[in-house]
From Swiss-Prot:
Organism phylogeny: Eukaryota, Fungi, Dikarya, Ascomycota, Pezizomycotina
Pfam family, one: WD40
Protein name in the entry: Ribosome biogenesis protein ytm1
SUPFAM superfamilies noted in UniProt: WD40 repeat-like
GO cellular component term, pick one: nucleoplasm
Compartments it resides in: Nucleus, Nucleolus; Nucleus, Nucleoplasm
Record gene name: ytm1
Family annotation (InterPro entries): G-protein_beta_WD-40_rep (IPR020472), NLE (IPR012972), WD40/YVTN_repeat-like_dom_sf (IPR015943), WD40_repeat_CS (IPR019775), WD40_repeat_dom_sf (IPR036322), WD40_rpt (IPR001680), WDR12/Ytm1 (IPR028599)
Repeat positions for WD: 111-155, 162-200, 211-250, 282-322, 371-411, 440-478
Native organism: Botryotinia fuckeliana (strain B05.10)
Predominant subcellular localization, coarse grouping: nucleus
GO molecular function: ribonucleoprotein complex binding
GO BP annotation list: chromosome organization; maturation of 5.8S rRNA from tricistronic rRNA transcript (SSU-rRNA, 5.8S rRNA, LSU-rRNA); maturation of LSU-rRNA from tricistronic rRNA transcript (SSU-rRNA, 5.8S rRNA, LSU-rRNA); protein-RNA complex remodeling
Function description: Component of the NOP7 complex, which is required for maturation of the 25S and 5.8S ribosomal RNAs and formation of the 60S ribosome.
PANTHER family: RIBOSOME BIOGENESIS PROTEIN WDR12, WD40 REPEAT PROTEIN 12, 37
Amino acid sequence: MAQGQVQVHFSTTSPDIELPEGKQQLLVPTNVRRYGLSQILNSEAMLDTSSPIPFDFLINGTFLRTTLDEYLTANGLSSETTLNLQYVRSLIPPLYEASFEHDDWVSSVDVLSGSSAAGAWGKNSIVEGQERILSGSYDGLLRVWNKSGQAIATSAPASIGGHTSGVKAAKWLSARQVASAGLDRTIRIWNYSESEDHFSAQLKPTMELYGHTGSIDSIAVHGPSNRILSASADGQIGFWTSHKSSAPEVNTSLISGPSTKRRKITTSTSTPQRGPLSLMDCHNGPATAVIFNPQDPTVAYSASQDHTIKTLDITTSSIVDTRTLLNPILSLSALPGIGHQIIAAGTTARHIALIDPRASAATTQAMTLRGHTNFVSSIFADPDSNYGLVSAGHDGTCRVWDLRSTRQGTKDEGLGVVGEAVYIIERESRKDKTTKTVGGEGVKVFDVNWDKDVGIVSAGEDKMVQVNRGRGVTRPEN
């Protein structure tokens, strides 16, 4: 029985591995899979590579995981069809690298490196090997780690200027400054300095910001303007400065309770206290996430358990657009998108909604990413790719997504375009356990960050910061 064949057209977005136009069309066997197609591309008659390059193939935005014949059958196509195969270098698994243990749940992580936003904002370049990981914990402390897993700095306790309750968010403002916020309803600014040998460091409290009446669950920072945004359980979005001289006076009625008593006892601590530049009444429920527009720091996006995403004009402290989803929203991230920006929103319904925030957009939701089995608590864009992102969930996993890998949704999924994870990162702390967790119990992941130099860094209920390889996961390494 003769082997079937099908005409294919090879294309790529990577100029360094693009075929000459005369070699882009080829008749290939229908029983071939990804590996066979990769061999064809590497052959002397095609790319003639000096050493084989593993390739993945996309057809209509979906990675090929079967034979071509099985793909044709599943999609009701005949072998007379010309298949357009987009080839990309194969993805590299996000292999486990290290874990850093804490005394309590870890709620927040951020990375300082030569490629991170804070590293780029600062005047001092970050030397390779001196990257730092910032973590915030429910024990009320911040810690700064080197890549070897040593905590080289720990923030002051409550008695001498630290948080009086759990930390929910922490960010590098620059290589010399950190912002944090949490259950004590305050934002705190810290100066960060290292010893000459870089084996030890210090976090010194320099300012306390008061204004919210509920827990602060998310902050965003813009180092060049010294601006900070906050999302609080009181439904408000706060706008702040890290410059003491520019910050308004504090409303003293907000400084009450245990922190005041501690101040009276510890007279040697005199951290300046300031108020917000503005507080915006944005949401009818707890505000859960806030981010700056990466291209325009006068624009921000906020999300809430009231099901809405708001586009904010920070200059006028006004709401310019509202998008309403079907479920409460817990996390946000801005993605470069293809030609325009996309907002990824993690929900309590276990999926990620991709939103076009432009007022002219015809539809609210451009795509849905499905796979998590519990709340989606954090999202971070791939620093190397327009197509990639990683999400953290209360199911105890981080999931890596490639927006080029899609399928048509079922009726139960509400139709539309659906994306599925290309990799699932489990918590390493569970690897030696024989009992299964239910819904992520004990290993919920609360935050995730994706840094080009350090990798995929996640934090969770297992009291660990976990580091996984991050380069080449959704695109080739440089």
